[in-house]
Design a protein with these regions (language model features):
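Sec-dependent N-terminal signal peptides
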Residues: 1-17
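Positively charged, low-complexity terminal tracts
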Residues: 19-200
Length: 200
């Protein structure tokens, strides 16, 4: 019975993903072959609430973080805090003439974030919290912070994917932070939801 209910919920999410709406783009220069990533929203996402889809890197053809509408600001705040820590560590490295380091940061990113990915079909992982510790790396002039998460499908435990997002500059952080503006992105989604609610 529980499995049937879960399948029905995921089917609703799948319909929503297929009806995703483009909101805008953020830039990230970690992969020189692709520097522009989509930010979209769906009206029936996590917990059947409007959710934001942030395109990221991963092993599947399409890879997304999913943030429900109530967590947009907390996700933005998390990336802001991570940016400040990135700036701080770069300063420490420069002051101490450190040119090579690979270190796990004791600074977990908090916020309930799910994942969606697609190869031949869509898969979803909603039962985890994006709370793993990031890695900070310096090698020569390259300075990066990487979040990576192995995710497993809610509907099939044998379907897994690795998704990740890497920041190589303050500009990478700022581009994502700026588009995750609850006052604009959240207001846009709530406006669409409000219009839908008048037709009952």
């Amino acid at each position: 019975m529980k499995k049937t209910i879960l399948s029905m919920i995921l089917a609703v999410i799948a319909v929503g993903v297929n009806a995703q709406t483009l909101y805008g783009y953020y830039t990230n220069r970690a992969d020189k072959s692709k520097t522009r990533y989509r930010v979209e929203y769906i009206m029936n996402g996590l917990k059947n609430k409007p959710s934001v889809l942030i395109e990221v890197m991963g092993e599947a053809d399409k890879n997304y973080l999913m943030i429900d509408i109530d967590n947009i600001k907390s996700a933005q705040d998390g990336f802001k805090e991570m940016k400040e820590k990135y700036i701080e560590w770069i300063k420490v490295a420069r002051e101490n003439n450190v040119t090579e380091v690979d270190k796990r940061m004791d600074y977990p990113f908090h916020g309930g974030i799910g994942a969606a990915w697609k190869n031949s079909q869509w898969w979803f992982s909603t039962g985890f919290c994006w709370n793993m510790q990031p890695y900070f790396k310096i090698k020569g002039i390259n300075k990066t912070v990487t979040f990576a998460q192995s995710v497993r499908s809610d509907s099939n435990e044998y379907i897994e994917n690795m998704i990740y997002i890497k920041f190589t500059s303050v500009q990478d952080f700022d581009s994502l932070i700026n588009i995750l503006d609850d006052g604009k992105l959240g207001a846009k989604i709530r406006g669409v939801k409000s219009k839908e609610n008048i037709f009952k």
